[in-house]
């Protein structure tokens, strides 16, 4: 431990606490300027409720910002699980890249210090809250589906071979290959550990012990998850956020901001889309655990289902519109001299989007399963105090996810998926 700490100091890294953070800000003009230069009465709050990092909100009477520092281990576990600090570089660059493509929904980066693994960025001010917390509280966000569809369509289309030359695409892939440690973490916790006995797996025991064992013994499920894992590892389709769940999104009724892309890499588009949709389905199944006499949550559950439906349909529409607009550009996936009629292009688009839809359903289901029988669970369920009630909600979600994952190619529309989800919403 001491040797590791000494090596980090030689590299210019030191974990900041509130006192040393103030000194760091004073010595960094790009950050001091955001606080109006008034640095003698700062309010600092550590809010890192994630699994990996320290996150500080810094307020002065003239400005605000957020400081995020990556630690050399997984915060959720401790220094027994080391983790590269370079993830901060990939997060900062991903925020900058995605903001250039979708400025309405990605916060600005003010400062990045690679040696310190530190990002200074916009403080996404109240009344913004983490979307997952809003879903637990039963808050409706009327623009969420359209905003997320816009974000996903732009970030995925403009970083794919539908828009870019092979040369430019390969350069992007090469830049983010070094974020392999984060991708390997995903491989382990999403595609491997839930399907075997693993040290950090947990479930709502004893209620779900048999359910977790059934996942580990399900041969058909393992065949399907192996296919998804291969796609995740091998298919550099577009530049992904890499962790696009409902705790990576901050919202108000009229604003949506996507944060925390430290898992960013080039991978299958369906992984981002599925992460978002799968977490909405988890939120749906959790609602009965949050219902009370004042609010049975039935109307809210309908809103969640409508949001899932709209998110895919808006995304499909926006993505194909971008494709049509740029079909004669530099993209090398479908060269205009070959796909030279509207009829042929329409056939290509239908096949492409159907495949993407099925990928999204598969990855979304995998993300649901890992949140119930794997390492990192979600507040949607964890905040249900009655363990028996929590397990009942989780079991419905788990059974739904397994069925969608196995049968994803049978679905022809998101509306069919919604009907399928509802069929599992009973004991």
Curated annotation (Swiss-Prot):
ATP binds at residues 49-53, 68, 122-124, 260-262. GO terms for biological process: L-methionine salvage from methylthioadenosine. The lineage of its organism: Eukaryota, Viridiplantae, Streptophyta, Embryophyta, Tracheophyta. It is an enzyme of class 2 (transferase). It comes from Oryza sativa subsp. japonica. Pathway: Amino-acid biosynthesis; L-methionine biosynthesis via salvage pathway; S-methyl-5-thio-alpha-D-ribose 1-phosphate from S-methyl-5'-thioadenosine (hydrolase route): step 2/2. NCBIfam families: MTRK. Catalyzes the phosphorylation of methylthioribose into methylthioribose-1-phosphate. Homodimer. The keyword Kinase applies. This is Methylthioribose kinase 2. PANTHER family: METHYLTHIORIBOSE KINASE (PTHR34273:SF2). The gene is MTK2. Transmembrane segments: none annotated. Belongs to the methylthioribose kinase family. GO terms for molecular function: ATP binding; S-methyl-5-thioribose kinase activity.
């Amino acid at each position: 431990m001491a040797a590791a700490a000494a090596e980090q100091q030689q590299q210019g890294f030191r974990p900041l606490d509130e006192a040393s953070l103030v000194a760091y800000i004073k010595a960094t003009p790009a950050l001091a300027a955001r606080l109006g230069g008034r640095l003698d009465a700062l309010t600092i709050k550590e809010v890192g409720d994630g699994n990996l990092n320290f996150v500080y909100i810094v307020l002065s009477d003239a400005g605000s910002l957020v400081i995020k520092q990556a630690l050399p281990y997984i915060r959720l576990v401790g220094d027994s699980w080391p983790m590269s600090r370079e993830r901060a570089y990939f997060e900062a660059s991903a925020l900058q890249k995605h903001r250039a493509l979708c400025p309405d929904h990605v916060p600005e980066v003010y400062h990045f210090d690679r040696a310190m693994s530190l990002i200074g960025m916009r403080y996404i001010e109240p009344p913004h809250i983490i979307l997952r917390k809003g879903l637990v509280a039963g808050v409706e966000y009327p623009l969420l589906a359209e905003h997320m569809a816009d974000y996903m369509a732009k970030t995925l289309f403009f970083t794919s071979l539908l828009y870019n030359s092979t040369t430019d695409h390969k350069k992007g892939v090469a830049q983010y290959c070094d974020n392999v440690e984060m991708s390997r973490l995903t491989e382990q916790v999403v595609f491997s550990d839930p399907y075997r006995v693993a040290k950090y797996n947990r479930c709502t025991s004893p209620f779900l012990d048999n359910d977790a064992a059934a996942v580990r013994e399900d041969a058909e499920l393992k065949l399907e998850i192996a296919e998804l894992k291969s796609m995740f590892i091998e298919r550099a389709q577009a530049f992904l956020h890499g962790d696009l769940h409902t705790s990576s999104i901050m919202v108000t009724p009229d604003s949506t901001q996507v944060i925390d892309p430290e898992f960013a890499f080039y991978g299958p588009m369906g992984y981002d889309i599925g992460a978002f949709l799968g977490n909405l389905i988890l939120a749906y199944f959790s609602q009965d655990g949050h219902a009370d006499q004042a609010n049975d949550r039935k109307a809210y559950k309908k809103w969640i289902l409508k949001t899932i439906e709209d998110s895919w349909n808006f995304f499909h529409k926006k993505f194909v519109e971008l494709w049509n607009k740029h079909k004669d550009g530099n993209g090398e996936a479908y060269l205009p001299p070959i796909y030279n009629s509207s009829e042929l292009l329409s056939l290509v688009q239908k096949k492409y989007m159907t495949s993407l839809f099925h990928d999204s359903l598969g990855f979304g289901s995998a993300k649901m399963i890992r949140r119930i029988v794997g390492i990192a669970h979600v507040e949607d369920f964890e905040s249900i105090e009655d363990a028996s009630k929590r397990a009942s909600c989780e079991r419905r979600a788990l059974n739904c996810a397994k069925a969608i994952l196995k049968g994803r190619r049978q679905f022809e529309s998101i509306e069919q998926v919604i009907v399928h989800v509802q069929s599992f919403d009973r004991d």
